[in-house]
Amino acid sequence: MRLSVIDHPLVAHKLTALRDARTDSPTFRRLADELVTLLAYEATRDVAVEPHPVTTPVTATTGVRLTSPKPIVVPILRAGLGMLDGMVRLLPTAEVGFLGMIRDETTLQATTYANRLPDDLSGRQVFVLDPMLATGGTLVAAITYLLERGARDVTALCLLAAPEGLEVVRTAFDDHAQVTVVTAAVDERLDENGYIVPGLGDAGDRLYGVV
Protein backbone atom coordinates (compact mmCIF):
# COMPACT_ATOMS: atom_id res chain seq x y z
CA MET A 1 0.00 0.00 0.00
CA ARG A 2 1.15 3.51 -0.80
CA LEU A 3 0.21 6.61 1.18
CA SER A 4 0.17 10.16 -0.19
CA VAL A 5 -0.51 13.03 2.22
CA ILE A 6 -1.01 16.21 0.21
CA ASP A 7 1.13 19.04 1.59
CA HIS A 8 -0.27 22.20 0.03
CA PRO A 9 -1.37 25.50 1.61
CA LEU A 10 -4.75 25.52 -0.19
CA VAL A 11 -5.45 21.98 1.00
CA ALA A 12 -4.61 22.96 4.58
CA HIS A 13 -6.69 26.14 4.35
CA LYS A 14 -9.82 24.35 3.10
CA LEU A 15 -9.39 21.51 5.57
CA THR A 16 -9.21 23.99 8.45
CA ALA A 17 -12.52 25.52 7.35
CA LEU A 18 -14.07 22.04 7.12
CA ARG A 19 -12.97 21.26 10.67
CA ASP A 20 -14.67 24.38 12.06
CA ALA A 21 -17.87 23.37 13.89
CA ARG A 22 -19.45 26.68 12.82
CA THR A 23 -19.24 25.80 9.10
CA ASP A 24 -22.80 25.18 7.85
CA SER A 25 -23.79 22.37 5.46
CA PRO A 26 -23.88 24.43 2.22
CA THR A 27 -20.42 25.84 2.93
CA PHE A 28 -19.15 22.43 4.02
CA ARG A 29 -20.34 20.89 0.73
CA ARG A 30 -18.63 23.59 -1.32
CA LEU A 31 -15.36 23.29 0.59
CA ALA A 32 -15.39 19.49 0.36
CA ASP A 33 -15.96 19.74 -3.39
CA GLU A 34 -13.02 22.13 -3.79
CA LEU A 35 -10.76 20.03 -1.57
CA VAL A 36 -11.55 16.84 -3.48
CA THR A 37 -10.59 18.49 -6.75
CA LEU A 38 -7.19 19.31 -5.25
CA LEU A 39 -6.79 15.74 -3.98
CA ALA A 40 -7.93 14.35 -7.33
CA TYR A 41 -5.14 16.21 -9.12
CA GLU A 42 -2.59 14.20 -7.14
CA ALA A 43 -4.61 10.97 -7.11
CA THR A 44 -4.72 10.87 -10.91
CA ARG A 45 -0.99 11.44 -11.35
CA ASP A 46 -0.57 7.81 -12.51
CA VAL A 47 -3.78 7.53 -14.51
CA ALA A 48 -3.20 5.43 -17.62
CA VAL A 49 -2.72 7.33 -20.88
CA GLU A 50 -1.70 6.46 -24.43
CA PRO A 51 -0.15 8.48 -27.28
CA HIS A 52 -2.65 10.34 -29.44
CA PRO A 53 -2.01 12.33 -32.63
CA VAL A 54 -3.36 15.87 -32.75
CA THR A 55 -3.18 18.70 -35.25
CA THR A 56 -2.70 22.17 -33.81
CA PRO A 57 -3.25 25.41 -35.77
CA VAL A 58 0.49 25.27 -36.47
CA THR A 59 1.44 21.64 -37.10
CA ALA A 60 0.79 17.99 -36.33
CA THR A 61 2.12 16.59 -33.06
CA THR A 62 1.50 13.82 -30.58
CA GLY A 63 -0.15 14.22 -27.20
CA VAL A 64 -1.83 11.73 -24.88
CA ARG A 65 -5.35 10.67 -23.98
CA LEU A 66 -6.84 8.39 -21.36
CA THR A 67 -6.67 4.73 -22.32
CA SER A 68 -9.50 2.24 -22.44
CA PRO A 69 -11.08 0.85 -20.37
CA LYS A 70 -12.09 4.11 -18.74
CA PRO A 71 -11.36 4.69 -15.05
CA ILE A 72 -14.27 4.14 -12.70
CA VAL A 73 -15.09 6.38 -9.73
CA VAL A 74 -16.82 4.71 -6.78
CA PRO A 75 -18.22 6.87 -3.97
CA ILE A 76 -19.11 4.98 -0.79
CA LEU A 77 -22.64 5.94 0.16
CA ARG A 78 -23.68 8.26 1.58
CA ALA A 79 -20.84 10.57 2.53
CA GLY A 80 -18.79 9.68 -0.53
CA LEU A 81 -21.42 11.31 -2.72
CA GLY A 82 -20.24 14.68 -1.43
CA MET A 83 -16.89 14.00 -3.10
CA LEU A 84 -18.20 12.88 -6.48
CA ASP A 85 -18.50 16.20 -8.31
CA GLY A 86 -15.00 17.26 -7.34
CA MET A 87 -13.59 14.01 -8.69
CA VAL A 88 -15.45 13.80 -12.00
CA ARG A 89 -14.62 17.45 -12.67
CA LEU A 90 -11.10 16.22 -13.43
CA LEU A 91 -12.21 12.87 -14.90
CA PRO A 92 -15.38 13.74 -16.81
CA THR A 93 -15.18 10.63 -19.02
CA ALA A 94 -14.89 8.24 -16.08
CA GLU A 95 -17.69 5.83 -15.34
CA VAL A 96 -19.34 6.06 -11.93
CA GLY A 97 -20.34 3.14 -9.74
CA PHE A 98 -21.70 3.06 -6.20
CA LEU A 99 -21.07 1.04 -3.06
CA GLY A 100 -23.43 1.26 -0.12
CA MET A 101 -21.61 0.40 3.09
CA ILE A 102 -22.50 1.01 6.70
CA ARG A 103 -20.47 0.74 9.89
CA ASP A 104 -21.98 -0.97 12.91
CA GLU A 105 -21.43 1.57 15.69
CA THR A 106 -21.07 -1.23 18.26
CA THR A 107 -18.68 -3.58 16.47
CA LEU A 108 -17.23 -0.89 14.13
CA GLN A 109 -17.40 -3.49 11.33
CA ALA A 110 -18.55 -2.52 7.82
CA THR A 111 -21.20 -4.34 5.82
CA THR A 112 -22.28 -3.85 2.19
CA TYR A 113 -25.96 -3.14 1.63
CA ALA A 114 -25.93 -2.03 -2.02
CA ASN A 115 -23.73 -1.93 -5.09
CA ARG A 116 -24.04 -0.64 -8.63
CA LEU A 117 -20.83 -1.83 -10.24
CA PRO A 118 -19.83 -3.94 -13.23
CA ASP A 119 -19.30 -7.59 -12.27
CA ASP A 120 -15.99 -7.58 -14.14
CA LEU A 121 -13.52 -4.81 -13.35
CA SER A 122 -10.58 -6.45 -15.10
CA GLY A 123 -7.93 -3.93 -16.06
CA ARG A 124 -9.83 -0.99 -14.56
CA GLN A 125 -8.33 1.80 -12.51
CA VAL A 126 -10.73 2.51 -9.65
CA PHE A 127 -10.94 5.65 -7.51
CA VAL A 128 -12.81 5.13 -4.23
CA LEU A 129 -14.29 8.17 -2.48
CA ASP A 130 -14.65 7.92 1.30
CA PRO A 131 -14.19 11.14 3.29
CA MET A 132 -13.13 9.62 6.61
CA LEU A 133 -10.62 6.79 6.97
CA ALA A 134 -11.27 6.06 10.64
CA THR A 135 -11.14 2.41 11.73
CA GLY A 136 -10.31 1.27 8.21
CA GLY A 137 -12.97 -1.44 8.13
CA THR A 138 -15.14 0.21 5.49
CA LEU A 139 -12.25 0.98 3.17
CA VAL A 140 -10.72 -2.50 3.48
CA ALA A 141 -14.09 -4.07 2.68
CA ALA A 142 -14.56 -1.78 -0.33
CA ILE A 143 -11.08 -2.31 -1.75
CA THR A 144 -11.31 -6.08 -1.25
CA TYR A 145 -14.65 -6.08 -3.06
CA LEU A 146 -13.12 -4.22 -6.02
CA LEU A 147 -9.93 -6.28 -6.25
CA GLU A 148 -11.93 -9.52 -6.17
CA ARG A 149 -13.72 -8.28 -9.27
CA GLY A 150 -10.47 -7.76 -11.11
CA ALA A 151 -9.65 -4.08 -10.56
CA ARG A 152 -6.09 -3.39 -11.73
CA ASP A 153 -5.38 -0.80 -9.07
CA VAL A 154 -7.40 1.06 -6.48
CA THR A 155 -6.80 4.59 -5.22
CA ALA A 156 -8.80 5.81 -2.22
CA LEU A 157 -9.37 9.55 -1.73
CA CYS A 158 -10.05 10.54 1.88
CA LEU A 159 -10.38 13.99 3.38
CA LEU A 160 -8.90 12.73 6.65
CA ALA A 161 -7.25 9.57 7.92
CA ALA A 162 -6.48 8.19 11.37
CA PRO A 163 -3.24 6.29 12.07
CA GLU A 164 -5.22 3.29 13.31
CA GLY A 165 -7.23 3.08 10.10
CA LEU A 166 -4.16 3.46 7.92
CA GLU A 167 -2.50 0.60 9.77
CA VAL A 168 -5.53 -1.62 9.17
CA VAL A 169 -5.45 -0.83 5.45
CA ARG A 170 -1.68 -1.27 5.31
CA THR A 171 -1.91 -4.67 7.01
CA ALA A 172 -4.66 -5.82 4.66
CA PHE A 173 -2.83 -4.75 1.50
CA ASP A 174 0.80 -4.70 2.57
CA ASP A 175 1.89 -6.80 -0.41
CA HIS A 176 -0.37 -5.05 -2.92
CA ALA A 177 1.58 -2.24 -4.57
CA GLN A 178 -1.45 -1.08 -6.54
CA VAL A 179 -3.45 0.13 -3.54
CA THR A 180 -2.97 3.83 -2.74
CA VAL A 181 -4.51 6.15 -0.15
CA VAL A 182 -4.52 9.88 -0.90
CA THR A 183 -5.54 12.17 1.97
CA ALA A 184 -5.38 15.80 3.04
CA ALA A 185 -4.08 14.95 6.53
CA VAL A 186 -3.36 12.17 8.99
CA ASP A 187 -4.86 13.13 12.34
CA GLU A 188 -3.80 12.20 15.88
CA ARG A 189 -5.94 9.19 16.79
CA LEU A 190 -9.39 7.64 17.15
CA ASP A 191 -11.50 8.21 20.24
CA GLU A 192 -13.37 5.49 22.12
CA ASN A 193 -16.28 5.77 19.68
CA GLY A 194 -14.13 5.32 16.60
CA TYR A 195 -14.19 8.99 15.58
CA ILE A 196 -11.12 10.76 14.23
CA VAL A 197 -9.52 13.28 16.63
CA PRO A 198 -9.38 16.23 16.07
CA GLY A 199 -11.27 15.33 12.91
CA LEU A 200 -14.20 17.27 11.52
CA GLY A 201 -17.17 15.37 12.95
CA ASP A 202 -19.43 13.03 10.98
CA ALA A 203 -18.82 13.94 7.33
CA GLY A 204 -22.19 12.60 6.16
CA ASP A 205 -24.12 14.55 8.76
CA ARG A 206 -22.20 17.73 8.02
CA LEU A 207 -22.68 17.35 4.27
CA TYR A 208 -26.37 16.54 4.32
CA GLY A 209 -27.68 17.21 7.81
CA VAL A 210 -28.48 14.58 10.44
CA VAL A 211 -30.89 11.97 9.03
Swiss-Prot record:
Keyword Glycoprotein appears in the UniProt entry: no
InterPro entries recorded: PRibTrfase_dom (IPR000836), PRTase-like (IPR029057), Upp_B (IPR034332), UPRTase/APRTase (IPR050054), Ura_phspho_trans (IPR005765)
GO MF annotation: an example: magnesium ion binding
Keyword list, A-Z: Allosteric enzyme, Glycosyltransferase, GTP-binding, Magnesium, Nucleotide-binding, Transferase
Cofactor(s) needed by this chain: Mg(2+)
Pathway: Pyrimidine metabolism; UMP biosynthesis via salvage pathway; UMP from uracil: step 1/1
Role description: Catalyzes the conversion of uracil and 5-phospho-alpha-D-ribose 1-diphosphate (PRPP) to UMP and diphosphate.
The protein, known as: Uracil phosphoribosyltransferase
Organism this protein belongs to: Kineococcus radiotolerans (strain ATCC BAA-149 / DSM 14245 / SRS30216)
The gene coding this protein: upp
